[in-house]
């Protein structure tokens, strides 16, 4: 309530940190996407690249995917100092890991007839991939990149919590000082930024899917604008600051990661790794389930296929507002309502899940075949039974994969919610890193890697069953 009305006089002080946030997200997304495009074919199982390279790449991707952008940013500050360079480095790694996995999975599922024909003509594997596989998967690849850009804006907005630049430091400061009118202004600017990026992403996605067309001159201007935006964001980044980078600290860091604290790793106490990881999984699981239950009906209210346009516009706006707020901010807000602990973490991830799941469910509804539903309506069947018998059977596999993906995301987000007192493994990990207790940090990171790997295996089996 104290955020309304926002302090509009504070906008001028927000613009530069907001630019840094956009700068990190744009540069990190483009660089991470580029590296993923170049290296992802080496991870595909059906293209004949050496198995050793494929295994090494997949192990690296698995390790990087185990950590949220905030943890990657905190690690980067020890290497490159404080500032936007560390934040951009973290967003690049985060994007690279996700995009590489998605792309080599798409390549593995693609039709390889054109690829095999080119190989039979003596074309090298990589060139055959470019001409035989890439044209098939590039629309999905670019769509995933646009979705990650929107996600990375929210990630970049909290990297200031660990000194990696952007609007996060300002946001944390104003929340700590209880200046909620200024917090409202910051969140309003983030919301407007997310709205602009989402509209632009939808426009580009429609061009990619050939649902819209533009003239050649307009296409050239669009490419020129995108190139200029990337160059401006890249060449105005802060340079890495190695003046505070201690070689001894780096040696201790890597030694701690290679020789973790095994007593903490195997501890069965309440403050041991096993209990904290279990708490993290429970927070992520319950938050995902609550989010999925709420999101399913909201998705039907969010699309013009099932409700009038004004109703869908209203719900679209509400969901966009929910998605524009960084998850750590929700954690800080709910702590003041329910106090610190795992329950706050569940509330936080439930609300964040509603934002993402409703968006993805709506996209699935917009893409389904509506003819069975309209046929049942024409026969006099009421809308709810018609949805149950014609829509839900089509959506079950898609909804399942979306929910599993969100659970995977929630595991990583739950792993840093402890930073604001919302339970899980986050607080011990960040405190260990800030206190240079690298053996304990190494044990926690190893636990996260194994946890995410196990969840990936379970998710793959569930997905295969669907």
Stretch-by-stretch model annotation:
Residues 25, 29-41, 45, 70, ...:
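Hydrophobic positions within alpha-helical transmembrane segments of bacterial inner-membrane proteins
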Residues 78, 152-190, 336, 412-448, ...:
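Glycine-rich helix-loop "coupling/hinge" segments at transmembrane-helix boundaries
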Residues 143, 181-237, 442-466:
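C-terminal transmembrane helix and the adjacent membrane-cytosol boundary/short C-terminal tail
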Residues 15-23, 57-64, 150, 172, ...:
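Alpha-helical membrane-interface segments at transmembrane helix boundaries
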Residues 61-95, 319-350:
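Generic hydrophobic transmembrane alpha-helix motif, especially the helices
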Residues 1-26, 30, 34, 46, ...:
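N-terminal, non-cleaved signal-anchor transmembrane helix
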Residues 82-148, 155, 199, 340-391, ...:
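Membrane-cytosol interface at the C-terminal ends of specific transmembrane alpha-helices
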Residues 38-73, 102, 297-331:
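Cytoplasmic-entry segments and transmembrane alpha-helices of multi-pass inner-membrane transporters
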């Amino acid at each position: 309530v104290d955020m309304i009305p926002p302090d509009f006089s504070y906008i001028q002080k927000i613009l530069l940190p907001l630019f840094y946030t956009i700068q990190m997200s744009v540069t990190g997304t483009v660089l991470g996407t580029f590296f993923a495009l170049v290296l992802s074919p080496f991870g595909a199982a059906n293209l004949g690249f050496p198995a050793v390279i494929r295994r090494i790449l997949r192990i690296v991707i698995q390790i990087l995917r185990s950590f949220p952008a905030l943890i990657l940013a905190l690690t980067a500050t020890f290497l490159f100092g404080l500032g936007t360079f560390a934040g951009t480095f973290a967003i690049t790694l985060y994007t690279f890991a996700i995009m590489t996995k998605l792309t080599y999975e798409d390549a593995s599922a693609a039709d390889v007839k054109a690829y095999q024909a080119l190989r039979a003509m003596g074309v090298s594997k990589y060139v055959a991939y470019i001409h035989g596989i890439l044209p098939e998967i590039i629309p999905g690849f670019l769509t995933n990149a646009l979705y990650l850009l929107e996600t990375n804006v929210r990630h970049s907005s909290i990297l200031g919590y660990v000194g990696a630049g952007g609007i996060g430091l300002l946001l944390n400061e104003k929340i700590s000082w209880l200046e909620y009118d200024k917090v409202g202004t910051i969140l309003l600017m983030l919301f407007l930024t997310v709205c602009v990026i989402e509209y632009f992403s939808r426009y580009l996605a429609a061009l990619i899917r050939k649902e819209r067309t533009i003239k050649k001159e307009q296409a050239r201007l669009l490419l020129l604008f995108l190139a200029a935006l990337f160059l401006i964001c890249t060449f105005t980044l802060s340079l890495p600051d190695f003046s505070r980078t201690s070689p001894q600290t780096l040696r201790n860091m890597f030694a701690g990661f290679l020789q973790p604290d095994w007593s903490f790793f195997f501890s069965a106490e309440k403050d041991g790794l096993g209990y904290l990881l279990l708490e993290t999984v429970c927070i992520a699981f319950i938050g995902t389930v609550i989010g999925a239950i709420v999101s399913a009906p909201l998705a039907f209210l969010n699309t013009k296929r099932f409700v009038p346009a004004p109703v869908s516009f209203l719900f679209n706006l509400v969901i966009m507002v929910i998605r524009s707020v960084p998850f750590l901010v929700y954690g800080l807000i709910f702590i003041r309502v329910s106090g610190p602990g795992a329950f706050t973490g569940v509330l936080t991830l439930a609300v964040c899940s509603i934002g993402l799941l409703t968006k993805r469910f709506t996209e699935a509804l917009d893409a389904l075949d509506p003819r069975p539903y309209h046929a049942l309506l024409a026969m006099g069947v009421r809308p709810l039974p018609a949805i149950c018998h014609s829509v839900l059977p089509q959506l079950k596999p898609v909804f399942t994969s979306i929910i599993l993906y969100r659970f995977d995301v929630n595991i990583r987000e739950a792993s840093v919610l402890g930073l604001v007192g919302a339970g899980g493994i986050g607080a011990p990990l960040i405190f260990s890193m800030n206190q240079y207790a690298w053996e304990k940090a190494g044990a926690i990171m190893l636990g996260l890697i194994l946890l995410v790997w196990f969840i990936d295996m379970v998710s793959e089996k569930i997905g295969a069953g669907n």
